[in-house]
Each structure stands twice: as structure tokens, then as C-alpha cells.
């Protein structure tokens, strides 16, 4: 069976959501060559996947930030020009310490570029394209197999990087004596964890 990078990426997100025990949410605006991910994920509602085709790139990313806030594995997808538009909502996820996976299926060339030709032309934008020097890890896939693994790894990183804040708070509050105990409380979704989240959102 032949598999494209976009299809492998979609399956990687599904696998990560299943492993994490979370619903998968994709907020996206159709843009070549990333639209296939939206199409593929929309076929898998029975696996707890929600896809929303938004009115524009900004809404796609902002809706994913909201889904992350609600507890889903949140993903937004786009290509070169869309990353520019999503940057403010990406910054919102960073400052709120919410897990968010941003998929950039890159086009060749500047501006609208060559929509049907993929190449690695957005790397600098992916690394440094947000104001306020807000950090985001970047994973660059090189093959369909790598696309599956990269989507899975990006999802895992997004979810794991959010946990340390809660674990520190559990230690500071005296609820857990060490990081290992704090991690267990997070994984068990103990009431103390929800109390910390309530403090964050007030």
C-alpha cells in the first residue's frame, strides 16, 4: 500500500491521541498541500477525531487553542502563508502553556509559491517566525514513515511539555514529596491537579 506523507501524518496524530487517551481535534482552513490531512482525519470520527474547517487560518489556530484548553490533543494545519496568519494564536498557546501541534506542510518558493510542490522552504519561519521570541520545538520530517513518527513525537512533546508546570506546583503545595509522586497524580488526574488548572485559568 502506498502512503503519502499527509496520510501518515494524520495516522500519527490519531495514534498519539489514542495512546494519550484524549480526543483529537483539528482546526484548519483548506490550503494546498495541507488539506489532505483535514480530509483524512475527517474520515475517522469513530476514533474520537473532531475536524473543523474554519473560515480562515486565524480561526483554525484559535479554535485549536480552545480545544487544547478543553483537554483535547489539539492540532492545526497549514502551509507557508498560513503560518504567518497563525502566529498570534500560536503565541497565545505559548503564553498560556497549552499543548498545541502546528503542522506546516511546506510549499516551494515565497508568497503563494508552488502549491503543488513540497519542499523545506519554511524552516526559518518555523524556527523563528513568532514575535516575543516565543519558543516552539520544530520537527522536520523527511519521508512518509518519518511523517507518522514526527506527528506522534510532536503530539507527545506538546502534551509532556505542559506537565512539568503542574508537577512543580504539586511539589510546592506539599501535595507530592517528589516529581515521581507528582507525575503519578497527574496521570491519575487527581482532584489536586484540577485545582491547579482552576488557579491558572482564573
Where are these regions (language model features)?
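Electropositive phosphate-/nucleotide-binding environments in soluble metabolic enzymes
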Residues: 3, 7, 31, 35, ...
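Conserved thiamine diphosphate
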Residues: 117-163
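Mobile "lid/hinge" segments at catalytic clefts and subdomain interfaces of large enzymes
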Residues: 91-96, 107-110, 142-147, 155-168, ...
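Glutamate identity and glutamate-enriched acidic tracts
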Residues: 18, 55-57, 88, 97, ...
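Thiamine diphosphate
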Residues: 1-128, 135
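Flexible, low-complexity linker and terminal segments
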Residues: 1-11, 20, 155-202
Amino acid at each position: 500500500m502506498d502512503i503519502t506523507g499527509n496520510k501518515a501524518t494524520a495516522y500519527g496524530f490519531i495514534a498519539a491521541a489514542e495512546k494519550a487517551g484524549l480526543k483529537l481535534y483539528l482546526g484548519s482552513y483548506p490550503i494546498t498541500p495541507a488539506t489532505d490531512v483535514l480530509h483524512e482525519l475527517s474520515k475517522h470520527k469513530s476514533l474520537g477525531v473532531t475536524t473543523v474547517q474554519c473560515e480562515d487560518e486565524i480561526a483554525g489556530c484559535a479554535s485549536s487553542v480552545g480545544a487544547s484548553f478543553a483537554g483535547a490533543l489539539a492540532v492545526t494545519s497549514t502551509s507557508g502563508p498560513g503560518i504567518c496568519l497563525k502566529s498570534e494564536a500560536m503565541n497565545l498557546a505559548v503564553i498560556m502553556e497549552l499543548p498545541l501541534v502546528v503542522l506546516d506542510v511546506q510549499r516551494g518558493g515565497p508568497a503563494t509559491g508552488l502549491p503543488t510542490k513540497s519542499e523545506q522552504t519554511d524552516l526559518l519561519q518555523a524556527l523563528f517566525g513568532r514575535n516575543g521570541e516565543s519558543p516552539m520545538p520544530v520537527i522536520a520530517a523527511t519521508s512518509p514513515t518519518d511523517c507518522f513518527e514526527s506527528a506522534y513525537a510532536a503530539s507527545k512533546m506538546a502534551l509532556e511539555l505542559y506537565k512539568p508546570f503542574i508537577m512543580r506546583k504539586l511539589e510546592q503545595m506539599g501535595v507530592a514529596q517528589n516529581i515521581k509522586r507528582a507525575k503519578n497524580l497527574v496521570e491519575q488526574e487527581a482532584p489536586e491537579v484540577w485545582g491547579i488548572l482552576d488557579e491558572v485559568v482564573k
